């Protein structure tokens, strides 16, 4: 049983197809350009005048879990100012900075996305995160579960348990949370913040006597040995701090050649040059990515205007709360598993720092192969 798609204008960079009109077939849920001999066409759709291309994937977007609802509660004025009435085919919703679930799905579909992944699922809150994502229409969803600051893993590492034991724990967490990957946020730093520590670099021991390098190494190895499709998803140390590109390079090295994905790397690509002691280190980061085949990254490009930042990195969220706009914020500990910080923020194109952040993201886009 197959479905035929006729007359569409196909764009497929992976196969060097640029605007070619060609028929396609859907067989057993997969798209193919040839119909198998034993298949019969059961439906035909005319796509004349339409563009046919692969759906976009957002591998890091906050669309489910407690922090998103905290953000909605914090920005009620935004919810009220942006109502989205129902139509014949769409349900009602609201919000611009933090849209409701229905509006989130519709906006993603309008932009051509077909899959979105929530990168900060707390094990204790996984059920609620999945329920919220299930309420988001029109796109496939998945999540990465947070480890690397939880007391259980750190206690295992203190006791110097075997790698296989850590692998078992990671596998159990993945199964219990029903997530498709592992995320580490400021490895060991969120745990250190609970002890009133304000910074933790990659080779600095935290209160548990464990370094971020140790945590990243153990978790990246566990994810690799378990055969998880997505590599360890890493929010590196010292987000937003001038000079943090050195921490980012050290984080890449911590994986020791195993696959690792560095997220919103723009926020981890800062130097200390110039009058303001804040500069771009995009060249150094891009060169390192190009020369390190086990490392992938997403940019985390900023957009000017009002937004709200949601993160498990309580250390860095507390550091930035003085810049909240409007002036309200929250950080909290979650069951000794992880942290949560929610801060509204307005990126301004006339701000030196914000304009440079935008330019750094563009540099990375252009320089990474």
Sequence positions of predicted segments:
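Hydrophobic faces of well-ordered beta-strands that scaffold small-molecule active sites
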Residues: 55-59, 116-118, 141-145, 180-184, ...
């Amino acid at each position: 049983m197959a479905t035929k798609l006729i007359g569409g204008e196909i764009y497929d960079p992976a196969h060097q197809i640029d605007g070619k009109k060609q028929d396609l077939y859907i067989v057993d849920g997969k798209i193919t350009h040839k119909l198998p001999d034993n298949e019969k066409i059961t439906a035909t759709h005319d796509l004349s005048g339409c563009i046919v291309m692969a759906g976009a994937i957002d591998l890091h977007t906050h669309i489910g879990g407690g922090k998103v609802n905290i953000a909605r509660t914090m920005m009620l004025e935004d919810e009220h100012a942006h109502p989205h009435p129902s139509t014949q085919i769409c349900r009602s919703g609201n919000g611009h900075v933090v849209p409701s679930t229905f509006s989130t799905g519709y906006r993603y579909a309008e932009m051509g996305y077909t899959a979105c992944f929530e990168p900060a699922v707390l094990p204790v809150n996984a059920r609620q995160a999945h329920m919220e994502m299930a309420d988001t229409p029109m796109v496939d969803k998945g999540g990465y579960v947070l480890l690397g600051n939880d007391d259980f893993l750190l206690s295992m590492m203190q006791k110097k348990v075997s790698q296989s034991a850590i692998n078992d724990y990671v596998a159990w967490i993945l199964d219990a949370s029903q997530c498709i990957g592992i995320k580490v946020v400021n490895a060991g730093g969120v745990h250190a913040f609970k002890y009133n520590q304000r910074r933790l670099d990659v080779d600095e021991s935290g209160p548990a006597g464990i370094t971020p390098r140790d945590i990243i190494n153990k978790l990246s190895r566990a994810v690799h040995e378990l055969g998880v499709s997505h590599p360890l998803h890493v929010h590196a140390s010292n987000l937003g701090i001038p000079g943090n590109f050195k921490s980012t390079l050290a984080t890449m090295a911590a994986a020791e050649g195993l696959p690792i994905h560095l997220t919103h790397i723009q926020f981890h690509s800062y130097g200390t040059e110039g009058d303001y002691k804040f500069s771009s280190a995009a060249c150094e980061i891009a060169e390192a990515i190009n020369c390190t085949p086990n490392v992938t990254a997403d940019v985390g490009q900023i957009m000017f205007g009002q937004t709200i930042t949601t993160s498990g990195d309580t250390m860095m969220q507390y550091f930035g709360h003085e810049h909240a706009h409007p002036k309200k914020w929250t950080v909290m500990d979650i069951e000794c598993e992880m942290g949560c910080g929610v801060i509204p923020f307005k990126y301004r194109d006339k701000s030196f720092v914000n304009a440079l952040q935008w330019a750094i993201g563009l540099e990375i886009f252009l320089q990474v192969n």
